[in-house]
Amino acid sequence: MARVYREGDIGNEIAQKRIAVLGFGSQGHAHALNLRDSGCEVTVGLYRGSASWPKAEEAGLRVAEIPETVRWAEVVMMLLPDERQPPVFREQVAPNLAEGNLMLFAHGFNVHFNQVSVPPEVDLGLVAPKGPGHVLRSLYEEGKGMPALFAVGRDATGQARDLVLSYAKGIGCARAGVLETTFAEETETDLFGEQAVLCGGLSALLKAGFETLVEAGYQPELAYYECVNELKLIVDLIYEGGLARMRYSVSNTAEYGDYTAGPKVIDEGVRERMREILADIQSGRFAKEWVLENQAGGSSFLAMRRREAEHMVEKVGAELRALAAEGAQSPAGSPAGGESR
């Protein structure tokens, strides 16, 4: 079992360092605000004219352009989108790093697949909260924390491990627990989870279930409720207590169908394709494809985004959400669309 580091295991070295947070999106705003509220000295690095600049200032944070921010800092956390990181790092970050600095990333993609090259005299680390930034921030404000992974890619100073862990503590993650990993393991498992299960696999499963019912003549609205809308109820149960809690909470009929039908959906053919997806990630094939797609302007990516947005499941979902919102706004005792009884 991996060791879990908690607040009592970790020092406060990060509070003695000047920290640059590059980016002020979902993760950037949470890291910067949590660090500040933990007593750290933080500057947000952005490009001049960024829409996030006034937002960061309104939050009470110091903001400067990226080169200036990096020169000022001793610890630099890169929180720009993956596809924007390589040119920004090459042109604005790397030339301004000093010997003994700590360069941090929240995802290992660009380091693991050699899209950025951190100078050898600079420490290299990873702190990856396992959830979106707005949740990281809200948990911190509630006195709670979000689990995170950490890794040390290079320890040029002999102090990198303690400082990386201290950063994780500063953003509140040690309240929940911090697990050690490597850049390779974090990157490959994260990409696989996104592609085969959480995003790619799940999206395809939801659409396939919806389409199967609609093609069989069932109402699209019922197909949406059964195959998409109720997913949150199931996921919440799994989050609370695993698959066992979910199976305990559903009917015996649903549980029996889980055991008998599930293996028909996820059969050996699906498992083999999942192994192929993992192999493409491990070999760097997916990374190369994604890098080339961005270098070409992302036209294929944007076309897929537009096509998926036009799927019937999106239109039906939007209609049902609007109907639910209308019902929620109706006065008590006066059902929307009907007479008061």
Curated annotation (Swiss-Prot):
GO CC term, one of those recorded: cytosol
First-tier enzyme category under EC: oxidoreductase
Positions of substrate binding: 251
Gene3D superfamilies: 6.10.240.10, NAD(P)-binding Rossmann-like Domain
Binding site for Mg(2+) 2: 190, 226, 230
Keyword Electron transport attributed: no
Domain KARI N-terminal Rossmann, chain residue ranges per copy: 1-181
Cofactor(s) essential for the protein: Mg(2+)
Recorded metabolic or biological pathway in which this protein acts: Amino-acid biosynthesis; L-isoleucine biosynthesis; L-isoleucine from 2-oxobutanoate: step 2/4; Amino-acid biosynthesis; L-valine biosynthesis; L-valine from pyruvate: step 2/4
An annotated Gene Ontology molecular function: NADP binding
Top-level taxonomic group: Bacteria
Binding site for Mg(2+) 1: 190, 194
Keyword annotations: Amino-acid biosynthesis, Branched-chain amino acid biosynthesis, Magnesium, Metal-binding, NADP, Oxidoreductase
E.C. code: 1.1.1.86
Keyword Amino-acid biosynthesis: yes
Reaction(s) this enzyme catalyzes, per UniProt: (2R)-2,3-dihydroxy-3-methylbutanoate + NADP(+) = (2S)-2-acetolactate + NADPH + H(+); (2R,3R)-2,3-dihydroxy-3-methylpentanoate + NADP(+) = (S)-2-ethyl-2-hydroxy-3-oxobutanoate + NADPH + H(+)
Cofactor note: Binds 2 magnesium ions per subunit.
Disulfide bonds listed in the record: none
Residue span, KARI C-terminal knotted domain: 182-327
Alphabetized InterPro entries for the sequence: 6-PGluconate_DH-like_C_sf, KARI, KARI_C, KARI_N, KARI_prok, NAD(P)-bd_dom_sf
Family that this chain belongs to: Belongs to the ketol-acid reductoisomerase family.
Its job: Involved in the biosynthesis of branched-chain amino acids (BCAA). Catalyzes an alkyl-migration followed by a ketol-acid reduction of (S)-2-acetolactate (S2AL) to yield (R)-2,3-dihydroxy-isovalerate. In the isomerase reaction, S2AL is rearranged via a Mg-dependent methyl migration to produce 3-hydroxy-3-methyl-2-ketobutyrate (HMKB). In the reductase reaction, this 2-ketoacid undergoes a metal-dependent reduction by NADPH to yield (R)-2,3-dihydroxy-isovalerate.
Protein name: Ketol-acid reductoisomerase (NADP(+))
Organism: Rubrobacter xylanophilus (strain DSM 9941 / JCM 11954 / NBRC 16129 / PRD-1)
